[in-house]
Amino acid sequence: MIYFDNAATTMVKPRCVIEAVTQAMQHMGNSGRGTHGASLGAARTIYDTRKLLADFFNAEKATRIAFTANSTESLNIAIKGLFAPGDHVISTVLEHNSVLRPLYELEKKGVRVTYAECDEKGAIRPEDILKYVDSSTRGIVCTHASNLTGNMIDIARVGAAARKAGIIFVVDASQTAGVIPIDVQEMNIDVLCFTGHKGLLGPQGTGGLYVREGVEIRPLLSGGSGVQTYSREHPREMPTALEAGTLNGHGIAGLHAAVEYIMETGIDNIRSAERELMLRFYNGAKEIPGVRIYGDFDTEERCPIVTLNLRDYDSGEVSDELAFGYEIATRPGGHCAPMMHRALGTVSQGAVRFSFSSFNTADEVDTALDALRELAGGED
């Protein structure tokens, strides 16, 4: 199989990730639940991964990183734990349902939400967001990059303006963590939500959030914590406040190995390799008769995603043809991004997304282009 569905999850992982998970499953106990070696070893692995991620994102300290199962959980914790009736929150039409659905729930409870519009290429500039700031604006919640088009938002500019205005800035880094360098302090990010199984190259079931010192989030869950057993309330100190229950220690061990791999390989080297593959595919696909490509490719600031449609064919049918006729994996349909599809006019057709990893090759890209030419009936 040629795998071009890396924006959904990176299937090919570094060997060290697989080995770390295997070792953890054989030797890891439950962190914070005992003083025996297996429990202490788990605690050490979890702390070391917390510290590694803090360094990776330039967080103030390791305790500002809390682990979750994925970005969806992180975003629910942040959105539902920060805002209250009467608040005004600004978001965008680029968002995934993991942002939109929690916001829809808050709207029903009296939170006012404004969604910044995009241009014809699906791009949003900082001023498109910031123009909606008013005296009641409590937060800005936006993606770093669209999972549909790969278009990025200049979060450093948004963050600087938000910090100056005293507005909480929450960033969904699902598509960029591990792919694009992120410095939470330099970019003035108050809460960064990330998943481990995409660009970070870790196992599914891992994720987390960075919370800036001084930002208080109401916990979404309460329960076992391993500390303060006799208190009726869940501990309020980070990161325990946001980590009720047993953590995915096995997955976190794999995430540690994955982040180490990225740091050793160099995130800029990974980004360059993925960009080269994306442009190779884009430059070939745009010349195929009947292919319509979405997104802004006039800027270097984008994720390695090319989303397209072929004539008026249903995106699911095209993706099925690629999968069963050519063994090429892509993602069709709505991509959990309803507002973005409405903006692009692709609600009924959906779109076929090709997303690239540094583990892909130029030969695989060329094979996919040949397949598209055949499906388009426009062979050279």
Regions found by a protein language model. Give the residues of each.
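Pyridoxal 5′-phosphate
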Residues: 1-380
